[in-house]
Amino acid sequence: MAATNEVIPTSENPSDVSGSSQKLATEETALANGVDHEEEDSGEAGGEVFQLTVVLPREPHKIPIIVSSQEAIHDVRQSIIELPGTFQYSCFHLEHKGERINDFVQISEVPGLTADSEIHLVEDPYTEKEARIHIVRVRELIGAAGDRTDTLNGIISGVSLLDSVTSAESTQNGTSTAPSHPMVGFDFQASGTLSTLLPKAQEPGPKTIKSISVSPWNPPPYHLRQKGHLLYLQVTTNEGEQFQITSHVSGFYVNKSSTGKFDPSPKSAPKAHSAHSLLALLGDLSPSFEDSFKRLQEYNNTKEPLATFQITNATPSNPWIVPSASAPLVAHQADITRTQENYLIAGIENSETLRDWNEEFQSTRELPKETVQDRVFRERLTSKLFADYNDAAARGAILVARGEIAPLNPTEGKDAQIFVYNNVFFSFGADGVGTFASEGGDEAARAAVGKDVMGVRMVNQLDIDGLFTPGTVVVDYLGKRIVGQSIVPGIFKQRDPGENQIDYGAVDGKDIVASDEKFVSVFEKLSKALKVKKHAVWDKDGKRHDLEGSIETKGLLGTDGRKYVLDLYRVTPLDITWMEEVGTALDSPKEADVASESAYPHRMTVIRPELVEAYWKVKMREWVNGELERKRQAQKTIEPTAEEKEPGAVAEASEASKSDEPTENGELAKKADESDKDAEPSKPAADQERIDIGDFKFALNPDAFSGQQPQTDEEKAEFAEDEQQVRLVCEFLRKTVLPELVNDLKEGDVGFPMDGQSLSRLLHKRGINIRYLGQVATLADGKRLESLRILAVQEMVSRAFKHVAGNYLRYLPIPLTSSCIAHLLNCLLGTDLNATPKPDVDEAMAALYPDADLKFKEVSPESLKRDIEAQILRRFRYTLDSTWTAAIKHLQLLREVSLKLGIQLEMKPYHFTKQSQTEAAAAPPTTNGEATKDAAPTGKSTNGKKKKKNAREGSPASITSVNASSPVTFNPDDILNTVPVIKEASPRSSLAEEALEAGRISLLQDQKKLGQELLLESLSLHEQIYGILHPEVARVYNSLSMLYYQLDEKEAAMELARKAVIVSERTLGVDNAETLLNYLNLGLIAHASGETKLALTYIKHALDLWKVVYGPNHPDSITTINNAAVMLQHLKEYHDSRTWFEASLKICEEVYGKHSINAATLLFQLAQALALDQDSKSAVNRMRESYNIFLTELGAEDKNTKEAEKWLEQLTQNAVSIAKHAKDVQARRNRAGIRVSPRVTLGQTQLQPQVGQTAEAAAGRDSRSSRGLDSRSIDELLKFIEGSDQANKNKKRPGRSNPKRRGGAAAAAGK
């Protein structure tokens, strides 16, 4: 919880929300525990904020602390522990007027405790646990704690680069030879630099003591335990003195022991030292301690706090490129206490870490959720619990994969073995016992457990009373898929003869069907939410059973009396169109098994829930419109205006409302706040227009096409109808959803994916399964969609490689996996350097494993190529070109493969071609700092942070293999680590999302004050529920920073954007697509706040990331480069600005063609830039080109055409005038020295939408209000050049159309 105290935009928050601003300001020192701004509670009870004084036993004797009446005393304690003036206290209680205050009551419940009251901090006697916690804490505070032994998270997990990026800018500014701006010499076409992904080397912090550890005399003998001895410590100060310290119930004191003699009694005066806090005792023992501790705090204060907090509620991101093992950042240091930390944290019995996960999950779910307070507490607990469980399950899964845990059934085959560790039940995601024999065996089992996690997450999100799910995690590690589940009470119970193991759904395959009535009510609620139809199934005897859910979805009545739902891999129907196409829709399982090699690997091809939701919305809209039309016909008397108003409202409500569910009485009611205002004047009309959506019926049968045998004609007819309904949804996917997505990307209407992960997320959001990547690649036809085709092919290749590599890695002993991975990577990516790579296997190591399957040694580039092509044909129905290996982007494919397999590679120059290796060999040693396959671009000087390290490590072994005559790209030593890839089922916070949505709606309705209060409330809820370091919090920081940017709250926007960057770096990855977009938005906001050089630094870093993630010339980089050009104009760097506009235009012409509307828009801007650069002739030519395109594409009457024509005339007339005025510019600029206000930009920067988001949505605008070209006249341009436009700086200018909306949008703007 420590992290949650450092929250947030303080005084920079909007002044008109004083209460919320004050609340946020105070959260630096106090964690607001669920302050409730809802109207249902009284304003005062909503969380009154006031100041208390804490009286301390020693200096500074008193400290003020800001608290909220809703806070628990426990949170106040935590705040005191975190404050710099009081962090030596950890074992204490609080008293008010001599009465001890219970830690678990709220401040408002303490009698007589009001503003300016005094509470006393009273030190408690230590217990052994408190003493251990105190010691761990002091070690961390004084910088004596090394890195913890971590078996789960990889090298530099959770790293942030923002400090490095920002410091690069400030260092450059501080030098006399600093370039005039960060973009000097930037090379647009250079390949990516791996060092972009690593932080700069930092100076180590000052040392406060040499060492502190548990003494060899620990633990105390029995007779001394009786006297209050808890632990013995050993401390060596910076002065070199060694002290033996006793941890006693009364505190800490120096004892008489030495390394050879045991005497834990206190030393006598003058050497006697004792204190309640170990921190205070260390200050007494070491003369230099106070000074070095102060310097350490100053050193820590230079770092961004968010970058140093421990990540507790999310999985830290694991970078795929990491420093070499000997780099200072990760060098292994001797630390005796590293091995003792588990004991210090968990105690001698280690029992404190064992938890009953299932009971915790279910009892948390049973917590009340009536009030907002209840919901905050419940969701906060849920979030932490899922994070803890995911962590424990992933750690256990790695131990299972490494063979460290004994199976419960050692006589069974490997894939059928099950394990229990740390109260988590583990099994392999393979078909060990033949359950999926007819569905595709191991492949089907692997797919099923992945789908199961998704199903469990959906059920967790729905939060249905009385229905419980086990904790579920799937871990992929070195080719193995391992499922970790919390142990459901009764799942292992031996049932009596004739009694089923399962109470609802299929038992033992589908031969027996159980349908216990107790499950009907909860499964009915689940099915309604998931659009699942109640339907008949038949057992092996042909007996009919009516089930609420799929036959595969099972209900189990636990011995704890709770109803559990299991096996949620089939909550949606099978994709029959796909199955018929790929040969898996065969009636006979045996036929399917012996189907050709090209058949899809399994029959678990279900449609996505997002597709069902999208289809439901379409059907609902059709039905609503039909009903309205019917009512109109029936009620001719109602005024036409009232009639025409309603359909939009209903259709919008059905689309915009997140939970398109009917209200209690089954009516599609408007949101309360809207209906209060809107529905009041015309209640009778509204009542007549209201439609009862309870009459709308839509549900799908998930067991359609799954081999059910209806018995009667009536049953057959109904089943045929169910199957037809499923077919329509499958057709909707192919005929509507896929083409729409491709068209949106073609028109530039939405943010473009930049890597496999963002492409997958976009497909999933639209309800498209990954198996349709082949169709996406086929539909991505033409120059405009070339980027999409390249991405889709790259993603298919990386996924196929993952499957091929998994087959070789699955049963390979761990010490041989690096050789396997390196060889497979050489066969995939290193063939230009060495066409016949040989595996580098340590034969002595291999000899230790005589049974190991070393078939990877036989893999050649040709065989791997064939395997990948076959996998892509089977899984994606796509045939690669014969030249695909020549077309792959080496660096980007290496990144995709590493992320999918969890590989962490050493940061060094990887040579993919002979040319790059020759260049590197010929280069002087000093250039060894840049980790790319090409020479470093000139603009990359700031990234040479690894120079020293690489120069030191530039041995031939780091580039070539053992056999120097045949160099290879990758060696086994380059694979420093592999980390697990985790799929988990934690739900999102519905409460925090509701507040965010309500805030957005209020802003759209122009209720600015209410909107901002709700947004702040949502921010507070996100932080309380998730903790600060969580991907959802990064997303809300980013959304709010954009909204504040729109509201002109620049400081608050800047603070939130910085936090968004750090949190997404640490939880999603330093090169994740969301992180990159967060950097771009931070750049925009920094520019708007007047820090244009810093903004360009952020944008340069984002472009450097882009080169690694995608390569040059990404369609969305048109906007980014354009924004950078506008910023350079602000810095009066007119010539450089012009080259950036030209670069943007070049990419635009490549992607959209020379005669596209987007090209015309950019030509228009470039002409202005050329005019500023005093190149009047080129300016006139470019404006003429722009005018001609607008004229051809939009016609003479279009406002864009007219605008361009006006500019063209004036540019031609005033060419002479510009030349004349240009002479005065420098003198005037030097005299004035005024920074141009961002409001009077000639060009305007554009917001960067998230992948799949429209530009309008990113800007918080209505899509209907697209903007036209810059309407300023040439005279204003002249004034701008001369710096005389300052007088008008408060006058808002209409913006130019957004080049981000490539194509259709610009056209729309002009119509």
From Swiss-Prot:
Domain of life: Eukaryota
Stretches with biased composition (Basic and acidic residues): 655-691, 1259-1279
InterPro entries per UniProt: CLU-central, CLU_dom, CLU_N, CLU_prot, GSKIP_dom, GSKIP_dom_sf, TPR-like_helical_dom_sf, TPR_rpt
UniProt GO BP: intracellular distribution of mitochondria; mitochondrion organization
CDD domains hit by this protein: CLU-central
UniProt keyword terms in alphabetical order: Cytoplasm, Repeat, TPR repeat
Compartmental location: Cytoplasm
Domain Clu, first and last residues per copy: 335-579
Renumbered ranges of TPR repeats: 1034-1067, 1076-1109, 1118-1151
Listed Basic residues bias regions: 1289-1303
Keyword presence, Cytoplasm: yes
Keyword Heme: no
Any one Gene Ontology molecular-function term assigned to this protein's record: mRNA binding
Assigned GO CC terms: cytoplasm
Function text: mRNA-binding protein involved in proper cytoplasmic distribution of mitochondria.
Family designation: Belongs to the CLU family.
Record note on quaternary structure: May associate with the eukaryotic translation initiation factor 3 (eIF-3) complex.
Protein name: Clustered mitochondria protein homolog
